[in-house]
Structure formats: C-alpha cells, structure tokens
Amino acid sequence: MAQVPDREKALELAMAQIEKNYGKGSVMRLGDEMCQPISVIPTGSIALDVALGIGGLPRGRIVEIYGPESSGKTTVALHAVANAQAVGGVAAFIDAEHALEPEYAKKLGVDTDSLLVSQPDTGEQALEIADMLIRSGALDIVVIDSVAALVPRAELEGEMGDSYVGLQARLMSQALRKMTGALSNSGTTAIFINQLREKIGVMFGCMNYSTRVTLADGSTEKIGKIVNNKMDVRVLSYDPVTDRIVPRKVVNWFNNGPAEQFLQFTVEKSGSNGKSQFAATPNHLIRTPGGWTEAGNLIAGDRVLAVEPHMLSDQQFQVVLGSLMGDGNLSPNLCDRNGVRFRLLGYGCKQVEYLQWKKALMGNIRHTVRENSMGASFIDFTPLPELVELQRAVYLGDGKKFLSEEYLKALTPLVLAIWYMDDGSFTVGSKRVQERTAGGSGRIEICVDAMTEGTRVRLRDYLCDTHGLDVRLREVGSAGKAVLVFSTAATAKFQSLIAPYVAPSMEYKLLPQFRGRGSVTPQFVEPTQQLVPARVLDVHVKLSTRSMNRFDIEVEGNHNYFVDGVMVHNSPETTTGGKALKFYASVRMDVRRIETLKDGVDAVGNRTRVKIVKNKVSPPFKQAEFDILYGKGISREGSLIDMGVEQGFVRKSGSWFTYEGEQLGQGKENARNFLLENADVANEIEKKIKEKLGIGAVVTDDDILPTPVDF
C-alpha cells in the first residue's frame, strides 16, 4: 500500500509529459469534463430516427448507407443534408457517380445554392477533397456517392482487362484512417453511400458435379446437369423475411473449372435412407444454427440447417408439451436419422381409454401401438425432426426434465389439462365438508418428481403468479417424492380452467360441477417444409472423380438453395471498397425497397425498409419502414402517422385517423395531406413521440459546456 502515492505521482508525471509533448487535453480523466449528449442530424423519417435510437445520424461519425439499386440510399442521404442545412449547417456532396440531380435535391429541401458539390475524376481526388473539407472544421455533413464509383487512378489509367486486386480496398482503408480523427474533432458527419455486389463462384465455393439440388417439387437433380444444360428450373430456397421455404428460379449458371479437392458430407435426415450427401469445395458457405460457415470449418458432430417436413399442428404441439410434463417422453433416434421419437404410456383400462383419446389427437402421425407383459400400453410415433430442439432443451443429461421459463410461457389450458390427467391425483373432501360445500370439494396433488428441483420451483411460482393459485411444493411418502399440493380453492379454480380440455375417461379427476364440459376435437394441418438443425455424420476428402469441375447456380432473390435438403449459399452479397468501411462506420444501414405504392394503376412511390445492421451509439439490429414518394422523397407526414398510431397518439378507426379528437382524414393519403397543411400539428405529434421514446439529444442547454479546443 505504501507504493500507491508513488504510482499516482508517476502517473501525474507521465500525463504532464504527454501534455507537454502533444498539447493540453491530449490525455485526461473522463470525469474531468462534462460529457455532452450525442448531437444528431435528423433523417427526415421519425421511424428511422427511432430505430437509430438517438433521434438521427450521429455527428462526428462515419455512416454507411448501402443497398440494391434504386432502393432509396441517395434520397435518405439528401434528406440528412437538407436537415443539416435547415439549422444553418454547411453540407458537401462528393458526386463520384456524376449523377446528382439538382432539381430532385431541391424538392427534398436541399439548399442547392449553398451546397458544396464536387465531381472528382478519381477515387484519390474524391477522398482528398472530402478530407480537406472535413479538416476545415466548417462542414456539418459530407456525402460520398458512392464508394463503388471511387475508382483508383491506376485503374483508370491502365488498360482494359488489367487486374487491380485489392487496390480500392487499400485506398479506402488509408482514407478512413486519416478521416476518422478529423471527423470527430470537427463534428462532421460523413455519409458513404455503397452498392451491393454478389460474390459468385470461383472465389467463394462451388459444388461437385454429382451434388443433387433440391427442386421446387421436392425431387433432386445433379447440379452439373443443371449448369451444363442451363436448365430453366425452380429450386427450393429459404426466404428470411417470411421464414418460409419457397420456390425460386435459377437465373444464372456457373462452371468454374477444376477444383483441387471436394469435401464429401453426410448429414442425418428423417426420410429416405436417413442420409443427405453432397460434395463442396472447402470455402463454400453452409448454413448452421449460428450462421454461415465455410465447409472446411465443419467436422462430424457439428449441426447444419436442413429442410424437413413439419407435421404437428399447434394443438398437437400442446399435446406434446403436456405429455412431456407427465408420462410422455422424447427419445433420441438411435439410427443416425434426424428426429426424435415421441412416446405415450398408459396403465390399466382407464388409462388405455385416455391413451386412445391422445392417439386420436395425434391421428395423422404414423405410430405403432404395443403392450408389454405387465399390461402397460405404449404408443411410439415416427421420429419427428421438429421436436429435436425441444428434446435438447428438456433433457440436459441428469435424468430429470428441465422446463425453462420459455417452456412455461407456452403452457395453455390444454397443456395443463394433459399434465394433470397424466400425473395428477384428486382427493375428495370428507363427507361433512361435502355437505357444507355446494358441488363438493377436494384437493389436487400433481407429482413433479421427474423434474429438476429448479423446475419444480419455477412451475409452482408460475401457477401462483400467472393463475393466482395457492400451490405448495412438498415431499410425500417414504421415498420423499416431490408433489405440488393445491388448496381447496386452488383446486376448484384450476379444474374450472382445464375442464373443457379433460378427456371423458378422466372426468373422475374433476369435481362434479366441472364434468361433461370436455370439447376437444383433433386439429390437423398439412405438412410444411421448415428448417431444422441436422447433425453432420461424416466429413472426408472426396476421391477424385472423372469430373472435378466446380459448379454453382445463382438463385433469384434469396441467394440460397438446398443440396439434398441441406441449406447452402450461392452468392453472398457484399459491399464494395473492402472491409475498412465496415470497421470504421459507427452506423451501417441496409436500405431495401419492399413494396411499390400505387394510386390506381400508377406507381407513386416505394415502401422502404431500413435495417440498422451496426450501431455503436445505441442498440443495433432495429428496423424502420417509411414511404418514399417519387419527386418528393421521404414522406415525413406518413412516417409520423405510422409512428403515431404505433405509440397511441394517433387513433385509427377503420380508415379514419384521429388526433386528440380532431379528424386528420379518411385514408392515409388524406391524413398525410392534413399534416402537410398543418405543420404545427405534425410538429406536435413528432415532439410527443420523441419525448415518449426519449430520443433526440438536446445540445443547446445552458448547463452543457462546449468542449474546449486548442488551436
């Protein structure tokens, strides 16, 4: 402890030397100065401001806006320019694409007379101009449109066909290293607009000729045959927006020449011979539960995502949940096939009738019924891949069943009824009590000995907190089995809740007044194709074959397909300019056009979705939707209506929109026009939304001191 003063003194000497060498403020304690809230530039869409978490684009940071062509990237950037200018800011636009339309910018609110515009000839020139403007300290926002158009000088001066691998990426990396500090010091926001391109074929993995692609009708075809014949086929593909397996058209075919080697994969599946097989180059991307992974990084025992039929309806899944809490179990498939077996158990004639009732609810699932020498009846259902994750979550290896909080949230009256019918007992009160109690009384006990200790407590608390039941946990008998004991009042309340779901053969477990209410009828659904995890059984280097060429296809829209049921990527989307911009950007926004807005048959705009894929100033991964009207840009009023309805400030009744008793109009277009004509109402709604959500940093308060700057 005697060394502490010496350490403090040494630190003070070091800080003094640093300030002497590099200037005052070059190092300081974070608490020495009052922290300023983050200053922002509004985007023009309240929904996007909310998704960004701070009310707009942060000042002094790099922002990347990327997306497909005609998705609205430049429109979003120009609205930020207009909002910066509206409060007296200075804006610059580096038009590397030479495509800025002044009239359109003016309609969005941009002061084109004072806008600084540069149309550079090379990427180096564009970035040097941007750097010099930023270092002037007079700029509030600069837009570079676009990164893809920042062509290095060497490439422009070279010959057609010359290769310049990584040249633009190195240029961007160097420029961003120089710009980052200057942006922070000057408080300038730099918006980089970026394009999407696809990584196809030779650099990013391919398939062996014999690998079979899953077609839209469920059949398969060799990828080599599809490519060589340029077959016009539709394949199964996963749509992440709708979370569904959908047919998609093959729009391009690639034969990328010979490969050094292929990896042969064997993956478990439920049907056919129980195995999916395919051969891919080590760098081909395969979908796993944790995301995309290169084939060369996978080993036996890892899990990938595969398409399997889903058979269970919501009602049937509830039957499984209730049975798992009681006498049912899920057993792993021991034949190296995907899926787990759901087994039901019953004893005696009453239980057999109850077992038949359960079997009827699962009637569309293939099963076998058997009886052992002791008279116990069993029903074994065919292995179901959709129950694999449930089995992994419930059986953790200690022999007891583990029910998580998420499991308990899924409990319905039907689930509780099946659990009670499986493991519950009902004791009728004494004759004297029966005489005093209309309809009789009794107590329920439900055995929970097969569950973990933590699960027993969670289940008791769930019944108490969610259903208001007086339930105690105790041990009974010489074996000390754990049971949940219901009070008389809780028994009546619980039986009232589950009575409509009790099987006729189990009504003896109910009070007389609750009998005869059962009305459960089987509910079946058509099988659907869904993604489920599947275990990799084997990976090895495939022996050389006659054809060692690499084949790939490009799929419309989703950029993924299935090989013998396993999900693989065909052409990952990426942004231009290397990875430096991903690293240096504080905010990255993925802009997509999701719908065309029409007035009759005429297109009048687009519905746009923006995903915040990176955010270092607020929680990321939020998304916003708003309208972009042709010739007008982002519809601020439309966004206010959407957010107003969502936050409860604007009331929607049928097609009418109302704000504080005042009708805004019938239909969104009329309500939009009302707010356009009544700016004070629009501003009031915006203010209330921002106050409720706590966004929009205030930077003009008297108690906030400006950061001192030494020149």
Swiss-Prot record:
ATP binds at G67, P68, E69, S70, S71, G72, K73, T74. The keyword Nucleotide-binding applies. Residues 320-420 form the DOD-type homing endonuclease domain. Keywords: ATP-binding, Autocatalytic cleavage, Cytoplasm, DNA damage, DNA recombination, DNA repair, DNA-binding, Nucleotide-binding, Protein splicing, SOS response. This protein undergoes a protein self splicing that involves a post-translational excision of the intervening region (intein) followed by peptide ligation. GO terms for biological process: DNA recombination; DNA repair; intein-mediated protein splicing; SOS response. It comes from the Bacteria. InterPro entries: AAA+_ATPase (IPR003593), DNA_recomb/repair_RecA (IPR013765), DNA_recomb/repair_RecA_CS (IPR020584), Hint_dom_C (IPR003586), Hint_dom_N (IPR003587), Hint_dom_sf (IPR036844), Homing_endonucl (IPR027434), Intein_C (IPR030934). Gene3D superfamilies: Homing endonucleases (3.10.28.10), P-loop containing nucleotide triphosphate hydrolases (3.40.50.300), RecA protein, C-terminal domain (3.30.250.10). It is found in: Cytoplasm. PROSITE patterns: INTEIN_C_TER, INTEIN_ENDONUCLEASE, INTEIN_N_TER, RECA_1, RECA_2, RECA_3. It holds the Pfam family RecA_C. GO terms for cellular component: cytosol. GO terms for molecular function: ATP binding; ATP hydrolysis activity; ATP-dependent DNA damage sensor activity; damaged DNA binding; endonuclease activity; single-stranded DNA binding. Can catalyze the hydrolysis of ATP in the presence of single-stranded DNA, the ATP-dependent uptake of single-stranded DNA by duplex DNA, and the ATP-dependent hybridization of homologous single-stranded DNAs. It interacts with LexA causing its activation and leading to its autocatalytic cleavage. Belongs to the RecA family. This is Protein RecA. The gene is recA.
